[in-house]
Amino acid sequence: MHSDPGPWHPLLCFLVLALSTSANSDVTPRFTSKPLSTVQKPGGPVTLLCSAEPPWAHISWLFNGEQFERISSQGVDIQSGHLVIPSLGPAHVGQYQCIASTSVGAILSKSVSVSVAYLNDFETTTGHSVTAEEGSSAFIGCKIPESNPKAHVRYKVRGKWLKESSDKYLILPSGNLHILNVSVEDRGTYRCAAYNPVTHDLKLSTSTLKLSVNRSPRVDSRILHPVTSQAVLVQIHDPLTLECVVGGGPSHPPVYWYKGGQEAAAYGRRKLLHTHLVIEQVQRSDAGNYSCVLGNGSGISQRVYYTVIVLEPPSVSQKTEDQSLTAGSNVRFSCESRGNPTPNITWFHNAVQIHASTRHQISGNKIRITSLFAQDSGIYQCFVNNEAGSAQVSQRATVHLKWSKPVIVSPPTSIRVANGDLVTLTCNATGIPTPTIRWYDSHGPISSHPSQVLRSKSRKALLSKIGTPGQDPVHYTMSQAGSSSLYIRAITVQHAGTYKCEATNEFGSAHADAYLTVVPYEMSTKPEDITPLDLTQSDEGDYDSETRVPDHSQINEHKPEPRVTEKPYSGASLPEAPIILSPPQTTKPDMYNLMWRSGKDGGLPINAYFVRYRKLDDDGNMVGNWNSIRVPASENEFPLTELEPSSLYEVLMVARNAAGEGQPAMLTFRTSKERTSSSKNTQAPFPPIGVPKQTIIHGVSNTNNGLVPVDPSRHSGVPEAPDRPTISTASETSVYVTWIPRANGGSPITSFKVEYKRTGGHWNAAAENIPPSKLSVEVSNLEPGGLYKFRVIAINNYGESRRSTVSRPYQVAGYSIRLPNPLIVGPRIDQTEAVTDTQILLKWTYIPENNNNTPIQGFYIYYRPTDSDNDSDYKRDMVEGTKLRHLISHLQPETSYDIKMQCFNERGASDYSNVMMCETKARRSPGASEYPVLDLSTPSVPDRSSSPSHSPTRNGDFLYVIVGCVLGGMVLILLAFIAMCLLKNRQQTLMQKFEPPGYLYQGADLNGQIIEYTTLPGTSRINGSVHTGFMGNGNINNGCPHLHHKVHNRASEVGNGELYPGCNSSLKETYVDYDRLPHHLSNGRVMYTALPQADPTECINCRNCCNNNRCFTKPNGSYCGNGVAVMPVGFSPQQEEGETKPLNHVMVPMCLTSPDQNCSEEIEEDQNEKETQLSANSVCPEEATQTGTEQHEGEDCTKTEDDSSILTWTPLILPAISKDCDEKHVWTSTDITLDKSNVDHPQLQTQEA
């Protein structure tokens, strides 16, 4: 039985993992796989592989020495670990290099070439014949066309293809054919062909060769091939054949090969193949001059020479070491290499070529860098290359700005803890180079190993060992560069004292002290005495705030806790782990109800439970810090709140009695997704199982009421299945299997077991009886190229747990055949939403890393009605690319569907995803409004947000429609208002245009006749100007309905008098009085009166124009000479109802006399009227206006005019009149034609617009 690792074992494992990861972050990158040169046919795919260690190294590519980011990379797909050219073209041909970068620096791989395969045509030749003697050798020559890669030569011999050499026919490396022991059957035609193994092109020579066989007498032997000396280039370790074809008689003299005057075939690696010299593996010593000698009895008859040049790829012989340098110093690097021909040397710094400069001095195979800066830190590479290949060696250099002694920036703090608690002291220091930190106590340096504290000790055992010499150490250290933490578990009074942190580097040291105070245990167990005992350490070494639940039973009863000395520990032990009853998934996204029942108390009552929980990622790695909660012993459930939706959490729970803390119970659970109103059907969460708050009685059955039951192993005492194991490479034939344990079922885990199986095989045990302190094991002796899966089993006193989830398939290196289906893990469906009665919106997440970043071409979406059990009912939609949403259409209304997915590429499809159910909406009634369907296309870059929208999309669109309609209506109203204002302004402008301040009556002869009109009190203007009227030189007929604007409150009277006696014609003042005439208010605020219409025949010589109540005459009209008395117009005394105001009397003078009249009249003011202002439009400024209005009496009308529908209005332009009326004046006018529709109205009323 293995000793128990204790409740802090998971924490220790995570600390070791975190520290090892941090320590490896400063690792020099190195390539684990490098790209290889490739020849491909035009349009074919090309894949260049490149991987490096550490795994987080960044991979980039160079093309012909330029970064792909700086040049056009069209048609090239760069992904993690490989570069893919889907269709090879001329633009892709060139040299490629791979760069691996980390925080330390960057390294550059050797240059590889990507070229296009081709095969040229044979040169055009004419056919010829070859004659050979029977029994001798024949030589058939073939000039192979240029090809990439080198073409394979074939021969068509008498209608049959010869692809490889045989006993009789030798196809030489040069492509020529050597026929041995020629016979008559060998006669016929021969034709050579070239075959390209990449493009699979086969091209025939343009001519054929005819072989003739002679049975002639013996002839002299001769060398048929070659006929001239040859130079041959061969790479070291390649095979070489030096050709020498001898023809002649059936038997020829022997053939000898010499090298440097010595027989060449005497050497073991050099052999004769008929008359050819074959060297199996060329070495450097095989270079030199060779000769093929044909001899006869009389001496040497013929020979041919070969010069062999052995090409040797460069190699670097020296070993390099990392260098630590100081800023401002100098450094020298050398590169010892060899090769044939002599290699060229190129230096690179962090994958950038170094050119000679004042600071970089390059001489031969050495480089010297002076006055180093911090930027000179990194990786230096020496590249050597020649015609045979290339090689490189790298060396890391670190440049420190300045050296400095250590400085402790975060010293340990003195603390006061309870007996038996866990203590953490932390110390951080800086310095150049980074200092090393060690701890000291009163006994000296502390150097315990973590493995010594993996055994759990009870508090009783620890207390009983106080003062006992040779006790096991209970403290250990975890250190990395510049930082260290000292952990002391189950502290006792003996550990109290001073602890010193010492930081040391090459230039000095520094130290800081902290004092540790240990208080008795009974002081810490009282509810009112809270100490750091209940705090738990986070993975970063900091303490988190804790949440406490008051123990009401202890507070109310005030029962004192028993002291350690009050009760003997005989027969008592630590409590067993609580039995957690909660399901592994909660129905709420932000809360988990933790429920449990107590295990055996160990003979002492349980004082409290301690719950610690933290967040994990989907791979089981820690994300958040530990949160600690103290729960009273009387409780058996507690809600964990403020959790994140769709997240994985780990819970560690222990019970404490007077003897100490017992074994921990572990659990992992996942919170549910955050519900949204837009998703009607989501994946059903794992239902909870109701557990009463009272302690559960053993042996009582509990029904699930149709709910999914919890894993029965959780109540049987066996541990929970560990998490899915992760696999990492250990060597070419071994792997590391790592896992995370879960709840122990109430009994400590005693061991683990790892099983494995190969694809298509059975499960076998890889390792058994693994101590609980080990969470990783190496599995070796795996077959190269095999595909394996692994699983883990936890074991305690109750038995074995269920098998863990099977690991992802792992392929051992060395397997050359491509996998039939590299896509293993499919996408995960996140959300389904019924958009309409026939459409469902599907959203999913795909993680390329789950399939080793294997490229995919798209997704398959399968759906069928939920009530169907036939897989053939599934329909499939295909989504190309890397979209993460799709709209499934043409569905049945109000029908539930099962939906699942796969990802695929050209080699197959992945496993199925999770299955989701979603029901379409009910069918809409006819005429119901339908919201527009949104564009559901998304970019290729995935959005992995786990929180869906909280409001339906269509409501937002409807709101936009309403807002748009309101804004549109407001704009239309504003435009209408602007149009009305513009129209009103135009009318007023036209009004002012045709109503000048002074209205001029037109006629052939106009005298200075005065037309008098009345305005409201205080005003004498119409439309802002004094209005003046002019009458013609004639009489007004009795019935002429003209307005003369004489309205005042005086009594009616008729009077005539001469106003201007100096003129030939006198102007008479005339008044016309009518009772109760209608009055109108013009827009110039002038009260006027309209006269009743008389017989139109009496107005034949006068025309009315309804324009501000003034009467105009036609320009060609004349007035009568008879004087007509006009009654003054006034208000009747019976004018009641409204209040009437007196109207002002306004007189407008005008002097329009004949030329012989003197116009120097004076204007007297009426004594009974108020003085009024002279009109600004008076032609004679010297004249004044008299009270009243005179009407000129003229002769009878002698001229009539017909009633026309067109009225011509000619405004006068009057020149200034001099004081003497002797000179002639000319008036000009402009005709304006108006419609006369209003003139013929039966009752004339003048109205202003």
Swiss-Prot record:
Annotated Basic and acidic residues bias: 545-566, 1190-1202
Positions with biased composition (Low complexity): 937-952
Gene3D superfamilies: Immunoglobulins
Any one annotated GO CC term: plasma membrane
One Pfam family in the UniProt entry: I-set
Cellular compartments annotated: Cell membrane
Domain of life (superkingdom): Eukaryota
Keywords from the UniProt entry: Cell adhesion, Cell membrane, Disulfide bond, Glycoprotein, Immunoglobulin domain, Membrane, Repeat, Signal, Transmembrane, Transmembrane helix
Domain Fibronectin type-III: 577-675, 721-815, 826-923
Glycosylation sites: N181, N289, N296, N344, N428, N870
Signal peptide limits: 1-25
Acidic residues bias: start-end ranges: 1159-1168
Gene Ontology biological process terms from the UniProt entry: cell-cell adhesion; nervous system development
Start-end of Polar residues biased regions: 1173-1189
Residues of the Ig-like C2-type domain: 29-113, 120-212, 217-307, 314-400, 406-517
Disulfide bonds: C50-C98, C142-C192, C244-C292, C335-C382, C427-C501
Ranges annotated as spanning the membrane: 958-978
Record membrane topology: Single-pass membrane protein
Function, in words: Component of a cell-surface receptor complex that mediates cell-cell interactions between muscle precursor cells. Promotes differentiation of myogenic cells.
Record's protein name: Cell adhesion molecule-related/down-regulated by oncogenes
The organism of origin for this protein: Xenopus laevis
